[in-house]
Amino acid sequence: MKIVLAESLGFCYGVNRAVEATKRLLKEKRDARVIGDIVHNEIVMKKLKDMGLKVYPDLSSIDFSDTAENSVAIIRAHGASPDVEDFLKRRFGYVVDLTCPIVYNVFSLAKDLEKKGYFIVIFGKKDHAEVKALCGRLNDYLIVEPGYDFETIKAFLREKKPKKVALISQTTMNSESFEKLAEKLLKLEGIEVSVNNTICNVTINREKMAIHLAQTCDAVVVVGGKRSSNTGKLAKIVESHGKRAFHVQNPEQLPDLSIYRKVGIISGTSTPKEQILKILDYIKFTYEGEVIRNGGEV
C-alpha cells in the first residue's frame, strides 16, 4: 500500500496559538475557564481538561462560587460576541482573548461594511461559535446556511429592500459553495452587491489538497474531531469526487483498508500532529505501507 500525505497537516496558526496559550496558562497554575471548546477536537480538549481547564457550555452555567485571584477567562479561537466579552471582563479580573486574528479581521470587515450602509449576508452555520460571535457585532444580517433555497433568500431581500448587500463567510466554509452563492447574488437586479471571500486561505488550501488526494488515491483518511466544521468539510469534498472518505479520530475507528492500493491522509486545522502520527503509524505497520510525503510532514 502507498500512503500519501497531504502537503499541509496539523494545526493552523490560529488554533496552535490558542492551544499553546491555554497550555501556558494551565502550566502557570492559573484557574483557566472557557465557554465552549478551545478547538473542536475531542482529544485536544481532553488533554486541556486533564491539565485543569474548566469548560462551560454557556454563560449561565459558569460557577462563580469557586473563583479565585488566579482565575482567568479565555475567549476561544472562534471569538465571542461583545456582550459575552463584556460579561467576562466584569466577572473575571483577567481575560485572555485568543480569537484567531483571521476571524477577528472578518469581524472588523463586517462592522465596517455595515457602517457603510451594506446589509450583511453571512454564508455560514447559525449554530457555529464564529457565526454567533460575528452576529453579536451586527445590527441586522441574514445567515445563509449550506443547502439554502435561493428563492427564499430573494423573497427575504425583496421584503427587506436593501440598496446594498455585502456577502461574507464563516472562515471554514466550502469556497466553491461560497462562489456559487456570490454568483447568484450578483445577478440580482436593483441591488449593489459586494462580495468578500473571507474563507481562510489555509482551509482553502486544504480543500485543494482533499481534491488532489481524491483524484490520485483510492480512499482518503480524514483525521480530526467529529464536531470540527473544516474537518467534516474535507470528508465531504473527497466523497463528492467519488472516493471513500474515512473521518476518524483514532486508529480504532478505521475500517479494513486492505482493499486499497493507495490511501491519502489529510487533517482538519484543529487536528494535532501527534493524532495524525498515530493513525499514520497504524496504517503503515498494519498494511506495510510506503509513505509518500508529497511535501507533507508529521
Curated annotation (Swiss-Prot):
The cofactors it requires, by name, are: [4Fe-4S] cluster
Taxonomic lineage of the native organism: Bacteria, Thermotogati, Thermotogota, Thermotogae, Kosmotogales
The family annotation for this protein states: Belongs to the IspH family.
Protein name per Swiss-Prot or TrEMBL:
4-hydroxy-3-methylbut-2-enyl diphosphate reductase
List ligand-binding residues for [4Fe-4S] cluster.
Answer: 12, 100, 200
On the tree of life, the source organism's domain of life is Bacteria
Q: Give the reactions, separated by semicolons, that this protein catalyses.
A: isopentenyl diphosphate + 2 oxidized [2Fe-2S]-[ferredoxin] + H2O = (2E)-4-hydroxy-3-methylbut-2-enyl diphosphate + 2 reduced [2Fe-2S]-[ferredoxin] + 2 H(+); dimethylallyl diphosphate + 2 oxidized [2Fe-2S]-[ferredoxin] + H2O = (2E)-4-hydroxy-3-methylbut-2-enyl diphosphate + 2 reduced [2Fe-2S]-[ferredoxin] + 2 H(+)
Q: Does the UniProt entry include the keyword 4Fe-4S? A: yes
Report the HAMAP family cross-referenced here.
Answer: IspH
The job of this chain, per UniProt, is described as: Catalyzes the conversion of 1-hydroxy-2-methyl-2-(E)-butenyl 4-diphosphate (HMBPP) into a mixture of isopentenyl diphosphate (IPP) and dimethylallyl diphosphate (DMAPP). Acts in the terminal step of the DOXP/MEP pathway for isoprenoid precursor biosynthesis.
Encoding gene (name): ispH
The keyword Cell wall biogenesis/degradation appears for this protein: no
